[in-house]
From Swiss-Prot:
Membrane-topology annotation of the record: Multi-pass membrane protein
Key words, A-Z: Cell membrane, Membrane, Transmembrane, Transmembrane helix
Top-level taxon of origin: Bacteria
Pfam families given in the database record: DUF1328
Subcellular location per the Swiss-Prot or TrEMBL entry: Cell membrane
Record's protein name: UPF0391 membrane protein AM1_5042
ATP-binding found in the keyword field: no
InterPro entries: DUF1328
Family: Belongs to the UPF0391 family.
Main location: membrane
Transmembrane residue ranges: 4-24, 28-47
One Gene Ontology cellular component annotation held by this UniProt entry: plasma membrane
Amino acid sequence: MLNLTLTFLVVALIAAFLGFSGIAASAAAIAKILFCIFIVCFILVWPNKTGLVPVQEYPGRSCLHL
């Protein structure tokens, strides 16, 4: 998602450099929205740094010993 944000930011900068102010404003607005969504997702995932922990059906046993 951060890649999309950076892509729209680059598009906005190029469009602004070439004089397309409407396209630059739209791309900058999209980049801003995507960045905010990215930050919210990052804050929600950050406390759980390790990600999802797999659940074992039979603790201490592997599938081969059933």
